Swiss-Prot record:
Disulfide bonds: none annotated. Located at the top of the head of the 30S subunit, it contacts several helices of the 16S rRNA. In the 70S ribosome it contacts the 23S rRNA (bridge B1a) and protein L5 of the 50S subunit (bridge B1b), connecting the 2 subunits; these bridges are implicated in subunit movement. Contacts the tRNAs in the A and P-sites. PANTHER family: 30S RIBOSOMAL PROTEIN S13/40S RIBOSOMAL PROTEIN S18, SMALL RIBOSOMAL SUBUNIT PROTEIN US13M. Keywords: Ribonucleoprotein, Ribosomal protein, RNA-binding, rRNA-binding, tRNA-binding. It holds the Pfam family Ribosomal_S13. Gene3D superfamilies: 1.10.8.50, 30s ribosomal protein s13, domain 2. This is Small ribosomal subunit protein uS13.
């Protein structure tokens, strides 16, 4: 297993897939990294030389914001919105959807598990 940006990436998978294990690198950035270093996209991590792994490490450290730095930046952006007291900040604070989705029904991922209201009975016919 190669260690890049503090993450153990699987050695039996293709480089293109393995790079996605790093927070902040998705399909497009993984392909961009492979093309800039002229590494075949179908090459597996265990077939890479130590020199190629070092080049990948250096490129990611130099050009991309990943893992802890990116997580910290996202958290700071959310904290800034909350501190401003703007609409998006209020939605974050209340744990509701931020981007205008309906909440009368749905939004269960953001709101959490549904809680039954005590005392409310089903209508009888």
């Amino acid at each position: 297993m190669a260690r890049i940006a503090g993450v153990n990436i699987p050695s039996n998978k293709r480089v293109l897939i393995s790079l996605r294990y790093i927070y902040g690198i998705g399909p497009a950035k993984a392909r961009e990294i492979c093309q800039s270093l002229e590494i075949g996209e179908d090459k597996r991590v265990n077939q890479l030389s130590e020199d190629e792994i070092m080049k990948i490490r250096e490129l990611i450290d130099r050009d991309y914001r990943v893992e802890g730095d990116l997580r910290r930046e996202v958290a700071m952006n959310i904290k800034r919105l909350v501190d401003l007291g703007c609409y998006r900040g209020l939605r974050h604070r209340k744990g509701l959807p931020v981007r205008g989705q309906r909440t009368h029904t749905n939004a269960r991922t953001r709101k959490g598990k549904a809680v039954a209201i005590a005392g409310k009975k089903k209508a009888t016919r």
